[in-house]
A protein has these predicted regions:
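Activation segment/activation loop of eukaryotic-type protein kinase catalytic domains
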Residues: 255-291
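Conserved catalytic-loop aspartate of Hanks-type protein kinases
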Residues: 308
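Terminal C-lobe "cap" of eukaryotic-type protein kinase domains
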Residues: 365-368, 375-390
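Glycine-rich ATP phosphate-binding loop
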Residues: 126-151
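Short beta-strand micro-motifs within the conserved protein kinase catalytic domain, predominantly
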Residues: 179-190
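Activation segment of protein kinase catalytic domains, centered on the conserved DFG
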Residues: 210-231
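Catalytic-loop of the protein kinase fold
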Residues: 239, 243-260
Length: 422
């Protein structure tokens, strides 16, 4: 039988007498075939057992993972980035985990009149509203701006939202900074309540001055050189206050200055200051347009208040030109090489020598050569004495936002806004 099987493997005809299979040839042919077959069977069994073991481990890991998450969400390292419904998480535990005690800022939700809620814009993590807040005096209401954290948010976003409230609380009150009124963190949704700055941002105001005479508190209003100095002094005072707090702003620009009644300037846009304070300069995610940045920031060096002084010079340029984009002849991608060649902006036709001198002092390449906020205030106070208070600044050309955004290197959508929270 073995020989017959061997003849078949050799494809020998049964009648072929020349095909003779000797005993040793049978061993050479049959034994390897049997070994190969045995090896294939063993390999198949091993693979089957391995796959079965992997499947069992995955099922066990999945089951244990669900048990851990059901028992305690905070014990899992993955919950930091996993999105959850805030309605399923006690707000008190979120406050405890963030180690924030905000009870002294708490405002009763009933004091926010729901019938007065007006949507301003949809933010990245929630909506921003304008509302009326009861002041405690019968019949007297105060207009405020409410930033609400969306119900669907990650634990990190909740921690960040609460951190911004705490940051503003620690910052304290200054007449030239947008003020935190209070918060609602006793239940969902979480609210951050800020003062309402009625006249909007300075950049829009400057553009409107090009079109027509502004009206402020019912009185026709436009812009003079002296008023540019007045706004400059108020922004410099806010910078001096930030310097005392060992902070820097990071994005000084007309778009981040709000105008209140009586022409009071309020510096806003403190998001970068918060991120730097909370997470460090290397972890900042906010993007600042390059044409407002000091050279050291473009070179990725550690920021300081002296970088804000450079940007302050750009702010003066914006005001005296009624909102013209800086470096109009330079593309945003070429701005660093332009500055490295020791170039600065030329004196605008509407700018007097004294103001341009202050601008140039702000644009010193070496940060140590620039004035401090206190020095800046003194220079502005000296220059305002000889400034013009009757000649109205006039720029006949209206601004096209899309063209401005392209030249200035900013997002055109960021220019259309009524309010900035932090």
């Amino acid at each position: 039988d073995v020989k017959r099987f061997t003849r078949m493997l050799l494809e020998c005809n049964n009648n072929d007498k020349l095909c003779v299979v000797r005993e040793y040839q049978t061993e050479v042919i049959v034994v390897p075939v049997l070994l190969v077959g045995f090896f294939v069977i063993v390999l198949t069994v091993i693979l089957w057992l391995h796959c079965r073991g992997l499947r069992a481990k995955q099922e066990q890991s999945s089951a244990s993972g669900h048990q851990v998450n059901d028992k305690n969400l905070q014990e899992s390292s993955s919950t930091e980035n996993r999105y959850i419904q805030l309605s399923e998480t006690p707000v008190e535990s979120l406050l405890n985990s963030a180690s924030l005690n905000l009870k002294e800022l708490e405002i009763l939700r009933e004091k926010l009149s729901p019938g007065t809620l007006q949507l301003i814009k949809h933010g990245r993590c929630g909506s921003i509203y304008r509302a009326q807040l009861e002041t405690g005096n019968p019949g007297k209401m105060k207009t405020v701006v409410v930033k609400a954290l969306q119900d669907l948010a990650s634990p990190q976003e909740v921690k960040d939202f609460l951190g911004r409230i705490k940051f503003h609380q620690n910052l304290g009150h200054h007449e030239n900074l947008v003020e935190l009124v209070g918060c609602c963190v006793d239940q969902l949704p979480l609210y951050m309540i800020m003062e309402d700055v009625s006249l909007g941002d300075l950049l829009t105001f400057l553009w409107t001055c090009r079109k027509d005479v502004m009206t402020m508190d019912g009185i026709p209003y436009d812009l003079t050189e002296r008023q540019v100095y007045e706004v400059g002094q108020q922004v410099a005072a806010a910078l001096a206050y930030l310097e005392q707090k060992k902070l820097f702003h990071g994005d000084i620009a007309a778009r981040n200055v709000l105008l209140h009644h009586n022409f009071t300037a309020k510096l806003c846009g403190l998001g970068l200051a918060y991120e730097t304070h909370a997470y460090g300069a290397n972890s900042v995610t906010q993007i600042v347009p390059v044409k407002w940045q000091a050279p050291e920031r473009l070179l990725k060096k550690p920021p300081s208040i002296k970088a804000d002084i450079w940007s302050f010079g750009i702010l003066l340029y914006e005001m005296i030109t009624l909102g013209a984009p800086p470096y109009p002849e330079v593309t945003p991608s070429d701005i660093l090489s332009y500055l490295q060649r020791q170039n600065i902006m030329k004196q605008p036709s509407s700018c007097q020598k004294a103001m341009y001198g202050i601008m140039k002092s702000c644009w010193q390449w070496n940060a140590t050569d620039r004035p401090s906020p206190a020095d800046l205030i003194r220079s502005l106070q000296t220059a305002i004495k000889t400034s013009k208070d009757h000649a109205v600044l006039q720029v006949p050309e209206p601004v096209v936002p899309e063209l401005y955004a392209r030249v200035a290197g900013v997002d055109v959508h960021s220019l259309v806004r009524e309010y900035t929270v932090l």
